[in-house]
Regions:
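Positively charged, small/polar-rich N-terminal and surface patches that mediate targeting and assembly
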Residues: 1-89
Length: 89
């Protein structure tokens, strides 16, 4: 088993969950209002200076599911218009 901590802008959470559902991944935890800064993009600190926040999905998967999830996240990031839309794990 592998544990993923997937983080994305809150506005992309529903899309991410739909993609995961198509892979048959339905057991997970969601942490709402996750604040922070990633290597790409601007900080999301839910403040007047750095608006916005992330959501985090925590999921345990098999090795096969882990490969599918990595492929999914890489594809989402390649199709992103800006680094503000990136999904991190």
């Amino acid at each position: 088993m592998t544990t993923f901590c997937i983080s994305c802008d809150i506005s992309y959470l529903d899309d991410m969950l739909q993609h995961m559902s198509k892979l048959g991944l339905s057991n997970f935890l969601i942490l709402d209002r996750v604040l922070g800064k990633y290597p790409q993009g601007e900080p999301r600190l839910d403040s007047s200076i750095w608006p916005g926040y992330n959501a985090m999905i925590i999921i345990q998967v098999t090795e096969d599911e882990a490969e599918q999830l990595k492929t999914l996240i890489l594809r989402i990031n390649q199709e992103s218009l800006t680094n503000l839309e990136y999904v991190y794990w």
